[in-house]
Regions:
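Active-site substrate-recognition segment that forms the wall
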Residues: 1-122, 181-192, 197-203, 207
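C-terminal lid/capping helical subdomain adjacent to the catalytic/cofactor pocket in oxidative enzymes
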Residues: 118-207
Length: 207
């Protein structure tokens, strides 16, 4: 169903030993997402596991087969990441402690897919997260619980419908043509079932 819409991509992360470790403690160094001439990078303070951890979104833009993807990190991977650290975080650019590969699974617009199956509306799914799903795990879990229990959710997930990537007319969706959340306690109809939601405070989009 997601063939061609969920594209696996090889990623590489580095852990470097800071030469100025006092600058990379969690109380002084933030989680960052940095867009620079070389691309978009993300990283974290030293926490739990030793080392300044960071990577580059889309790394070398290598589309891979998950069954045969290169799981080794190479000298050219290390050079790309160290060049970034030397320029922007020189105090974090000590010896390389570790390099690890992983995969992002990206949609064409880099957004999530959260919806009901177009042919089997009793099935809900959440994939892929395009490399930025972890920080939304709690609310995605809430959305998926809503969909599993009622087929709709109080969160506005219209941005993440499957049909934005496929054909606009062939599915029941988690976001039909009425609000997914009632603020006045009125009922809405979906699939011959009445759904009623009590008044709740306005919910801001989670993305």
């Amino acid at each position: 169903m997601l063939d061609g819409l969920a594209v696996p991509e090889r990623q590489v992360l580095a852990w470097l030993q800071p030469t100025r470790p006092e600058h990379f403690r969690p109380d002084v160094f933030p989680v960052f997402n940095l867009l620079v001439d070389e691309g978009r990078f993300y990283g974290f303070p030293v926490f739990g596991v030793p080392g300044f951890k960071f990577g580059k979104y889309h790394h070398l833009e290598e589309i891979v087969d998950p069954e045969t993807a290169d799981r080794e990190a190479h000298d050219y991977d290390e050079k790309l990441l160290r060049d970034f650290a030397e320029r922007y975080f020189p105090g974090g650019c000590g010896p390389t402690m570790d390099l690890q590969t992983c995969m992002f699974t990206n949609t064409p617009d880099n957004h999530f897919v959260l919806d009901l199956h177009p042919d089997y509306p009793q099935v809900s799914f959440a994939s892929p997260c395009s490399g930025h799903g972890y920080k939304f795990a709690s609310v995605i879990g809430e959305v998926m619980a809503d969909l599993a229990e009622t087929g709709i959710t109080r969160h506005d997930i219209s941005l993440f419908r499957l049909d934005r990537l496929t054909q606009p007319s062939r599915r029941p969706s988690a976001m039909p043509d009425f609000p997914a959340r009632s603020t006045d306690g009125e009922a809405y109809e979906q699939n011959s079932h009445s759904r009623s939601f009590p008044r709740v405070p306005d919910v801001r989009p989670f993305w």
